């Protein structure tokens, strides 16, 4: 007990109730902390360092216990910069892992790895929190049925369908429409599935995170007037953060998504941009903790770390988390341990093509490079499978003929090949689609196309029933009826010009 000098009444020191340690060593973002005998914190416990530095600036650093070294010493990794910390400073063991706010209060807000809002919009309701370290759902809780997650985007639903509760790799360079595709998926899941989305920015540029936030506000995905009506929560741990924050920010985003799945029983989209940076941060932390590196300098625990994240992303009987993960491939080497370990968990890949983007075909999803384990007759049905295969065959034949066309021209092709080229060009244009989130930029109203409508449209093109329509009628339309209506309008316009 100690006495408060202003009231002379006895008050209990809050520090006396806490498990206190002291900093023994600081090496970059890694701290060694000594605790009293018998008072050692558990692995993954959060430690708080609070105080003032030599110039009187307030310090508030949270660390996570990674190793128990013996002699009452633990090694922890800081979640923020360790500037100003000194040996001998007091460290408080919180007695639990990092916990972050979850639920509806998180929608429309930006958080850091600790679940603190960083968007200057005031505090967040923290009555409901959840620890970021949790076990994956037990096998008995899983929903093991194969079911398609309809996105309303023609090229995705037809050629590389997403699995409900699956994991999708999103491959694409800068400026090919990755962000717009992500925002459209967020918009469509909210409208068609009544679901919400969580975006985890892992180790990417701060500017990109800010741009995404601004574009989401412009497109209405984040509702500025009524934040509670927003469709997405954002969690950022960007490039300038210490490796501990970048390694854990994916778990923070996943924890928020799990609450929507397990408690609200919703379908959730979880975006991770970029999953490679999660591995990279783990590699940095592993080296700082003194572990022996494995192949290509990666951490020896690479598969375990990846599995602990990916196995929590799944469908249960309550709801589902469908994850779309941007994958950076270092030096375009698909055999690098980081992307190779990621591929083992993916159900589908969506590859964005710069060639298609240059032609103005949006979304610029490559129909030949994008794949899905769901595209099997027993899962999607014979009709869907046959249509998708014929679309791919026609597109592949057109690709093979392009060199001949460039050198000799269309006239040198056989009648059959000319017909194939004409249909392939219609298919290529029909794979484009106006997006709801791009309305403010293009002026064209967005279109959600159901799977049955998508299949019917491509079957009509492949059957030759629409051979007489001009190919520009198929560009940036929703279903096939819009294409035929557009063809009639084009015909009327051309007659009026004459």
Curated annotation (Swiss-Prot):
Keywords assigned: ATP synthesis, ATP-binding, CF(1), Chloroplast, Hydrogen ion transport, Ion transport, Membrane, Nucleotide-binding, Plastid, Thylakoid, Translocase, Transport
First-tier enzyme category under EC: translocase
Gene3D superfamilies attached to this UniProt entry: 2.40.10.170, Bovine Mitochondrial F1-atpase, Atp Synthase Beta Chain, Chain D, domain 3 (1.10.1140.10), P-loop containing nucleotide triphosphate hydrolases (3.40.50.300)
SMART domains recorded: AAA
Subcellular location field: Plastid, Chloroplast thylakoid membrane
Pfam family, any one: ATP-synt_ab
GO cellular component assignments: chloroplast thylakoid membrane; mitochondrion; proton-transporting ATP synthase complex
InterPro entries for the chain: AAA+_ATPase (IPR003593), ATP-synt_VA_C (IPR055190), ATP_synth_F1_bsu (IPR005722), ATPase_a/bsu_AS (IPR020003), ATPase_alpha/beta_chains (IPR050053), ATPase_F1/V1/A1_a/bsu_N (IPR004100), ATPase_F1/V1/A1_a/bsu_N_sf (IPR036121), ATPase_F1/V1/A1_a/bsu_nucl-bd (IPR000194)
Keyword Membrane: yes
Main location: plastid
Chain's role: Produces ATP from ADP in the presence of a proton gradient across the membrane. The catalytic sites are hosted primarily by the beta subunits.
Family in the record: Belongs to the ATPase alpha/beta chains family.
Protein's UniProt name: ATP synthase subunit beta, chloroplastic
Organism, as annotated: Nypa fruticans
């Amino acid at each position: 007990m100690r006495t408060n000098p202003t009231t002379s009444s006895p008050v209990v020191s809050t520090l006396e109730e806490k498990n206190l340690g002291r900093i023994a060593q600081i090496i970059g973002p890694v701290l060694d902390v000594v605790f009293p005998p018998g008072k050692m914190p558990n692995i993954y416990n959060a430690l708080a360092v609070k105080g003032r530095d030599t110039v009187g600036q307030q310090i508030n650093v949270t660390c996570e216990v990674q190793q128990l070294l013996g002699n009452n010493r633990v090694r922890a990794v800081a979640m923020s910069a360790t500037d100003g910390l000194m040996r001998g400073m007091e460290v408080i063991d919180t007695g639990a892992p990092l916990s972050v706010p979850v639920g509806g209060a998180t929608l429309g807000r930006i958080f850091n790895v600790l679940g603190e809002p960083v968007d200057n919009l005031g505090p967040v309701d923290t009555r409901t929190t959840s620890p970021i370290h949790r076990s994956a759902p037990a096998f008995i809780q899983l929903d093991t049925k194969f079911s398609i997650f309809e996105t309303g985007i023609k090229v995705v639903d037809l050629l590389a369908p997403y699995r409900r509760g699956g994991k999708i790799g999103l491959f694409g360079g800068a400026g090919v429409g990755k962000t717009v595709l992500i925002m459209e998926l967020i918009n469509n899941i909210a409208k068609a599935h009544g679901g919400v989305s969580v975006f985890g920015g892992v180790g990417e540029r701060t500017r990109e995170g800010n741009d995404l936030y601004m574009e989401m506000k412009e497109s209405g995905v984040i509702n500025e007037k009524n934040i509670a009506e927003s469709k997405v929560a954002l969690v950022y741990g960007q490039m300038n953060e210490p490796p501990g924050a970048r390694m854990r920010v994916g778990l923070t985003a996943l924890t928020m998504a799990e609450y929507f799945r397990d408690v609200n029983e919703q379908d959730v989209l979880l975006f991770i941009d970029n999953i490679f940076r999660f591995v990279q941060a783990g590699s940095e932390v592993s080296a700082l903790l003194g572990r022996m590196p494995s192949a290509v300098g990666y951490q020896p625990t690479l598969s375990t770390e990846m599995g602990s994240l990916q196995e929590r992303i799944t469908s249960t009987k309550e709801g589902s988390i469908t994850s779309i993960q941007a994958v950076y491939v270092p030096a375009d080497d698909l055999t690098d341990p980081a992307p190779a370990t990621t591929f083992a968990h993916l159900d589908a890949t969506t590859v964005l093509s710069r060639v298609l983007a240059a032609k103005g075909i949006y979304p610029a999803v490559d129909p030949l490079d994008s794949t899905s384990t769901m595209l099997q007759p027993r899962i999607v049905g014979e009709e869907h499978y046959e249509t998708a295969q014929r679309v791919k065959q026609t597109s592949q034949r057109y690709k093979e003929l392009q060199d001949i066309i460039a050198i000799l021209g269309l006239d040198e092709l056989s009648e059959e090949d000319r017909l194939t080229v004409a249909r392939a060009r219609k298919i290529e244009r029909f794979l484009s689609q106006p997006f709801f989130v791009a309305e403010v930029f293009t002026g064209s109203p967005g279109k959600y196309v159901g799977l049955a409508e998508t299949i019917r449209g491509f079957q009509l093109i492949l059957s030759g029933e629409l051979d007489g329509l001009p190919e520009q009628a198929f560009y940036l339309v929703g279903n096939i009826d819009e294409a035929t209506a557009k063809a009639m309008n084009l015909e009327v316009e051309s007659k009026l010009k004459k």
